[in-house]
Amino acid sequence: MPGTDHAGIATQNVVEQELAREGISRHDLGREKFIERVWEWRSKYGGAIINQLKRLGSSCDWERERFTMDEGLSKAVREVFVRLYDDGLIYQGDYIVNWCPRCHTAISDLEVEYHQEGSNLWNIRYPYADGSGDIIVATTRPETMLGDTAVAVNPNDDRYHDKIGKEVILPLVNRRIPVIADDYVTMEFGSGAVKITPSSDPNDFAMAGRHNLEIIPIMDGNAVINANGGPYCGQDRYTCRENIVRDLEEQGYLVGIEPYAHNVGKCYRCKTDIEPTVSKQWFVKVEPLAKEAVAAVVKGNTRIVPSTWEATYFEWMTNIRDWCISRQIWWGHRIPVWYCDSCGKVIVSRTDPDRCPECGNATLRQDEDV
């Protein structure tokens, strides 16, 4: 049974590039007109994949060809969404996601490509608030220090036993933040003390939940520093990095720079560096599903060949994160959720509702995401 995917981000990018050559954007057209334009593009170029498969001699039942935006499949997507929502497996929440500043959308973990790049490890001096000295932290992203809300050390690190619970002064920002202890911190990395920026790192975000730390967003959707960045507001993240490093050095907070190679996450479509960002998204709870998948292999109902890959499979399944399914684009299956601004009711429906079942209001607003 042959078929093609609507490729939401990739297709929207191509059509937006066409519009850019005409000197307009999708926002100039509006959502409905833009989607019409995408369908026009699909009608013109969408058959290329099928024609290639036919030329390759693929033996398919071509009368059963499907496209993921066909009416039947669109109904199926809504059906699955509603069922999972009713079962408590789909929810909306503020969480840290992989944000592409170029595509202006969240993407899943599987849509992030990692490339090793040479960079630096900056060692920065954070003075103790009581004047008893300072603690050195190492970071590959000094620009994110604007959103620091703690410095963390390993609870088993003898070097910092008497420092846990103290406060330090965040350089350049002059904000007091605590020194906390967490098992996540690797004693061998840098000085053994790390800055915690919950709004810009998934691991820091998780640590903030464990220690009830404040989350301070420092960038907008374009990866430009926002008002929380003080004098750095309006600077893109890389310009801000240069200026932060310069100011740290001038004010005596920068104590060392070491060459450092690390993996940088990039958008799988446009290759822009991903910016971890806290935003409101729709998620699928995967832990209950992962438990069933693990049980299937343990019981022998599913076999992994070769069996040496079972350890990798179990590692992935036991350390899995909830799946972000919403995208801030226009081309795709729109989230089947409507909001009533009169009473606040959230309506999840297989069909487009014409009025609020709670208060009868006929003016409903559908979720913008796909």
Segments (PLM) and residue ranges:
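RNase H-like polynucleotidyl transferase catalytic core
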Residues: 1-2
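Serine-centered coil/turn micro-motif
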Residues: 157-158, 267, 358
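Glycine-rich (often Gly-Gly/Gly-Pro-rich) flexible segments and glycine-rich loop motifs
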Residues: 343-370
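Protease-associated
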Residues: 134-137, 142-196, 202-206
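Residue patterns forming the tRNA-binding/recognition surfaces of aminoacyl-tRNA synthetases
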Residues: 12, 16-134, 189, 193-348, ...
